[in-house]
């Protein structure tokens, strides 16, 4: 039974060690409020995606709410004509998507003349922005870019050719400029090749559902997935599937899209819902620092509901993956639930874990999370060390080998190395032993050396999210030199000054960049609390709360 928390401070305890530091009422209230807010959210806290919304505009003219989507499309175009967030190379795919959608609407001719004029201007500026982009890579490692980019370039050329032949109903005499060249590093034949490959097999793997729009036009009808809700949790994939059908979209498809559009004023995120990812990452961030007693029952329910002995999916319709599976095991342990490691076994390849079975590129952070799950499980169940001990040692060595010489780790899920480095350092500090000391210290030195003048950290510019990760890296070492103290003090000031200062920059990789706001808030909240309590780690709370087993 869970006791009533002290009105000033409270500590959550379970049979699994958690934070035992002094916790301010403000932190406890904020953390509990964040958990409660997430629990009431049926989709997850991400912003609309320009790329995704433009794909729905292009493929689903029958879906109510198009005027709002067009307003969003026009409003989101940058002064240089591009769309999207992040540096210019990240803007390639959203700009292709925006241009193609505007061309599709102009060809249909169902918009008011003023809207058509604005769309034509957006096309002209967008094509100019595409011509100004670099001609070759390296390009970001975002989801299925190797299929999505060539497919959209081909669609733009097709739209331009049809407008040249037929014109646009609302704009006499307007013609778009030349279509974009396919950037170096992409293969124009790949979408058709992938479709042909699986047509010969007779089935389409689930891994293509989330990015189905990239190959939808190349597949035979027999390979079109038939699912009742959003295909691969993606509005764009769902709209593309409906566009390939010979009949009108089903009521279920329309309802699934409308339910998401209602949340986003007609627009769409790249994945919905993201509840599994959001809840696991938020729970882990708070539990590693301090999980308020008021939030414990909710987080325990999340952990119990999400854990699956067959493996965990990050969202409905996606493949099972080692990252979410490891986090489900880890979060369960942090809140005193005992779940086995067996679901992770299917992803083990002999030296480390594949994030997906049959994946193209691996994930550092999935393996860092797996190391924490493995290490924690063995500490609680020492009789399993003969089974998992050798695997843990191999995983530790593999993770160390992935470190770059200057100190950071990269990862395919995040544009910033601070995320993967914080995750790797956390795993190696707890479960790497003496073998990991050099790797951790190298990462700490790198973090110290890359702090910005304002006390922040960031790959493109200082952000609160990346500063929270850097704080975790610096606090991982027991050797606190004066340089550490100064860096942490400056970080604490920066995080305090930036609180509530606006939306978080998009740094996470899906098809384009996105920002999982609740998860970011949890990391920042936890980092600020850890910085507050580092000054007096020996203080203890007067009324401990004992978590129910």
UniProtKB/Swiss-Prot annotation:
Keyword terms, alphabetized: Isomerase, Magnesium, Metal-binding
Catalytic activity of the protein: (2E,6E,10E)-geranylgeranyl diphosphate = (+)-copalyl diphosphate
Transport listed as a keyword: no
Motif (DXDDTA motif): 321-326
Top-level taxon: Bacteria
InterPro entries xrefs: SQ_cyclase_C, Terpene_synthase-like, Terpenoid_cyclase/PrenylTrfase
Cofactor(s) in the UniProt record: Mg(2+)
Pfam family of the protein (one): SQHop_cyclase_C
Gene Ontology molecular function: copalyl diphosphate synthase activity; magnesium ion binding; terpene synthase activity
Gene Ontology terms describing biological process: diterpenoid biosynthetic process
Notes on the domains: The Asp-Xaa-Asp-Asp-Thr-Ala (DXDDTA) and Gln-Xaa-Xaa-Asp-Gly-Ser-Trp (QXXDGSW) motifs are expected to bind to Mg(2+).
Similarity comment: family membership: Belongs to the terpene synthase family.
Record's protein name: Copalyl diphosphate synthase
Source species of the chain: Streptomyces anulatus
Gene name for this UniProt entry: rmnB
């Amino acid at each position: 039974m869970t006791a009533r928390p002290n009105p000033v401070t409270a500590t959550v305890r379970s049979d699994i060690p958690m934070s035992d530091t002094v916790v301010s009422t403000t932190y406890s209230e904020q953390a509990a409020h964040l958990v409660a807010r997430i629990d009431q959210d049926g989709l997850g806290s991400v912003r609309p995606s320009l790329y995704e919304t433009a794909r729905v505009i292009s493929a689903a003219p029958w879906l109510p709410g198009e005027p709002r989507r067009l307003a969003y499309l026009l409003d989101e175009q940058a002064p240089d004509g591009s769309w999207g967030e992040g540096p210019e190379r990240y803007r390639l795919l959203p700009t292709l998507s925006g241009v193609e959608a505007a061309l599709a609407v102009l060809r249909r001719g169902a918009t008011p003349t003023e809207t058509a004029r604005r769309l034509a201007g957006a096309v002209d500026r967008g094509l100019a922005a595409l011509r100004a982009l670099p001609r070759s890579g390296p390009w970001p490692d975002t989801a299925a870019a190797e299929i999505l980019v060539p497919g959209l370039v081909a669609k733009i050329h097709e739209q331009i050719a049809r407008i040249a032949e037929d014109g646009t109903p609302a704009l006499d005499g307007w013609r778009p400029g030349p279509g974009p060249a396919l950037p170096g590093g992409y293969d124009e034949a790949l979408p058709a090749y992938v479709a042909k490959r699986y047509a010969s097999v007779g089935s389409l793997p689930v891994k293509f559902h989330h990015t189905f729009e990239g190959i939808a036009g190349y597949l035979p009808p027999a390979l079109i997935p038939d699912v009742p809700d959003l295909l691969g949790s993606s509005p764009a994939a769902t709209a593309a599937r409906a566009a390939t059908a010979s009949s009108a979209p089903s009521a279920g498809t329309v309802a699934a899209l409308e339910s998401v559009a209602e949340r986003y004023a007609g627009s769409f995120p790249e994945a919905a819902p993201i509840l599994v990812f959001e809840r696991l990452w938020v729970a882990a961030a708070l539990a590693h620092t301090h999980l308020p007693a008021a939030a414990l029952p909710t987080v325990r329910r999340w952990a119990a509901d999400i854990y699956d002995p067959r493996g965990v999916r990050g969202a409905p319709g996606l493949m099972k993956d080692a990252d979410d599976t490891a986090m489900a095991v880890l979060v369960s342990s942090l809140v005193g639930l005992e779940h086995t490691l067996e679901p992770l076994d299917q992803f083990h390849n002999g030296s480390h874990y594949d994030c997906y079975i049959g994946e193209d590129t691996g994930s550092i952070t999935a393996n860092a999370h797996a190391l924490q799950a493995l290490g924690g499980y063995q500490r609680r169940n020492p009789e399993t060390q003969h089974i998992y001990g050798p695997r843990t040692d191999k995983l530790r060595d593999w993770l160390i080998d992935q470190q770059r010489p200057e100190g950071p780790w990269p990862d395919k899920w995040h544009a910033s190395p601070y995320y993967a480095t914080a995750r790797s350092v956390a795993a190696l500090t707890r479960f790497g032993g003496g073998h990991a000391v050099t790797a951790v210290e190298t990462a700490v030195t790198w973090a110290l050396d890359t702090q910005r003048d304002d006390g922040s950290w960031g790959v493109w510019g200082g952000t609160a999210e990346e500063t929270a990760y850097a704080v975790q890296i610096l606090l991982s070492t027991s050797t606190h030199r004066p340089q550490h103290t100064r860096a942490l003090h400056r970080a604490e000031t920066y995080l305090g000054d930036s609180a509530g200062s606006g939306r978080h920059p998009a740094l996470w990789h899906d098809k384009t960049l996105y920002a999982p706001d609740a998860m970011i808030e949890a990391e920042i909240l936890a980092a600020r609390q850890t910085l507050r309590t580092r000054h007096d780690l020996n203080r203890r709370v007067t009324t401990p709360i004992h978590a129910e087993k």
